[in-house]
Amino acid sequence: MPASRRVLIAGNWKMNGLKSSLAEIEALAAGYDGDLKAKLDLLVCPPATLLISAAERLAGSGVQLGGQNCHPAPAGAHTGGISAEMLKDAGVTSVIVGHSERRTNLSESDAVVMAKVKAAWCFGLLPIVCVGETAEERDAGEAVGVVTRQVHQSLPEGCTASNLVIAYEPVWAIGTGRTPTPEDVANIHGTIRSVLRSQFGAEADGIRILYGGSVKPDNAATLMAVADVDGALVGGASLKAADFLAIARATPAR
């Protein structure tokens, strides 16, 4: 990985976490020490109900705060929606968009994901765009084609190393304990890099590509050593600061 692509370890809490969980946020802030700060960025994405309190507890720690989703519209009659501006107002700097759970369960299209990327940009947020194939698509030999289509159709013009992160999450590996082989990960991440180059030229070499899918302390070192893997999008293992920090510590220095 080029030195310009700083490792990013991001934690997605999904629909987990109550006020009592802020103790884990405090532990995360305390554990992000000088050695970790020297080698990687650390980002945590708790549920929206905890964002403001989490921002207060993370202040000055260097741990970044992210949202799990944003509405494509800036404001208006969208009951239950959370805009990018609201996230920014809460202290957020990044936002996950296009997570497979939303693509699958809520039928979010590539076009909707692209609209969310643009919404994030409007308020200075860094979108983490998720792509990945289902088990059925993988078994049918369609993984490369699916991921290529998602990258092409989810990203607007103007993507750069400073305004975009990609996360490859094989849907069949999320929360299942199954992980693809390092060779499989390298193949898809290499494909994503090639697609980014075809769309954005040399700028693509600086765009970070994360791996997400049952990342744990005991497999992090192997996964993070794969070519074109620039970090991780961690699910369940990010809920406990000790586990999340263990993944960060297991990540090889670049």
Curated annotation (Swiss-Prot):
Leading EC class: isomerase
Keyword Aminoacyl-tRNA synthetase: no
Pfam families with a match to the protein in the record: TIM
Active-site feature positions: H99 (electrophile), E169 (proton acceptor)
EC number from the UniProt entry: 5.3.1.1
Keywords from the named record: Cytoplasm, Gluconeogenesis, Glycolysis, Isomerase
Listed SUPFAM superfamilies: Triosephosphate isomerase (TIM) (SSF51351)
Pathway where it operates: Carbohydrate biosynthesis; gluconeogenesis; Carbohydrate degradation; glycolysis; D-glyceraldehyde 3-phosphate from glycerone phosphate: step 1/1
Binding site for substrate: N12, W13, K14, G175, S214, G235, G236
Localization terms from the record: Cytoplasm
Cited Gene3D superfamilies: Aldolase class I (3.20.20.70)
Domain of life: Bacteria
Keyword Isomerase tagged: yes
GO CC terms, sorted: cytosol
Sequence similarity: Belongs to the triosephosphate isomerase family.
Functional summary from the UniProt entry: Involved in the gluconeogenesis. Catalyzes stereospecifically the conversion of dihydroxyacetone phosphate (DHAP) to D-glyceraldehyde-3-phosphate (G3P).
Name of the molecule in the record: Triosephosphate isomerase
Species, as recorded: Xanthobacter autotrophicus (strain ATCC BAA-1158 / Py2)
